[in-house]
Amino acid sequence: MIILGIESSCDETSIAVVKDGKEILSNNISSQIEIHKEYGGVVPEIASRQHIKNIATVLEESLEEAKITLDDVDYIAVTYAPGLIGALLVGVSFAKGLSYAKNIPIIPVHHIKGHMYANFLEHDVELPCISLVVSGGHTNIIYIDENHNFINIGETLDDAVGESCDKVARVLGLGYPGGPVIDKMYYKGDRDFLKITKPKVSRFDFSFSGIKTAIINFDNNMKMKNQEYKKEDLAASFLGTVVDILCDKTLNAAVEKNVKTIMLAGGVAANSLLRSQLTEKAAEKGIKVIYPSMKLCTDNAAMIAEAAYYKLKNAKNEKDCFAGLDLNGVASLMVSDEKAI
């Protein structure tokens, strides 16, 4: 089975070819990070225009690397939700054009499910499990049962963790994206430099706006007093607090649901402190932590193709998986609100 995956939900244009749910024949990505750097974040209109400019070229590169043609493709998987609506529409429209021209069925994929299924490309995942999804736009704890039903049991009430990293990095003058820089700075700083109060929110939900505000207020106060501090110390205090919260809530969810596996997913799953600390704390409770390789943490089309593979595999009737040419992009859609796959 050959699935062509298409991903364009934010600022990466990606097309991949995945065979039989395990073999990545190609996974090409055209990133826009350098373009958006000067703005300190993703500009939706620019992102959409870049997708239009790049998507045909990325397709050609992916097909060439996979050594196939469109005639060899059995299914087209495309991200349709959630994301920047203009960016989503580029990928969805491109998928519909290919489907119409070559009579290939379209399988719509939820972007967050794609991130979680990235783990299935590299691991034998034991279900049920808990997944911590952490990215620039999302922070969720999701329970996945034996039948691949996705149940959202926790979410951020304000900023996503990746968004908070970018905002703190902007205050510290570290550039965009902020996550990788803060990750490196953590090991050079003192995580106990600034005591940050952890927000009290219900059960498995998160709140990061107060932590971000504490960093901003401290920086402003120091500037008003003409006092200096080590940026590494403030970055370490911020990241240490955030990772503590992520680990504690995720582990509590895993214990309550009595699962033996935790999956990390999303761009922030590449964070070295989060990986090591969650793995260490989970091991104390007899729980295994798995996460994708670095190349599969960020937005990519291989994970979208993989999600489509399991959508087909678990469907009673494969035609229930298909979308027509009236498929549209959806900017906001909780993973629990989509039909189970």
Curated annotation (Swiss-Prot):
Catalytic activity annotation: L-threonylcarbamoyladenylate + adenosine(37) in tRNA = N(6)-L-threonylcarbamoyladenosine(37) in tRNA + AMP + H(+)
Sites where the protein binds Fe cation: 111, 115, 299
Gene3D superfamilies the UniProt entry points to: 3.30.420.40
Keyword Iron attached: yes
Keyword Acyltransferase (UniProt): yes
Annotated localization: Cytoplasm
Annotated binding of substrate, by residue: 133-137, 166, 179, 183, 271
Protein name as catalogued: tRNA N6-adenosine threonylcarbamoyltransferase
Organism: Fusobacterium nucleatum subsp. nucleatum (strain ATCC 25586 / DSM 15643 / BCRC 10681 / CIP 101130 / JCM 8532 / KCTC 2640 / LMG 13131 / VPI 4355)
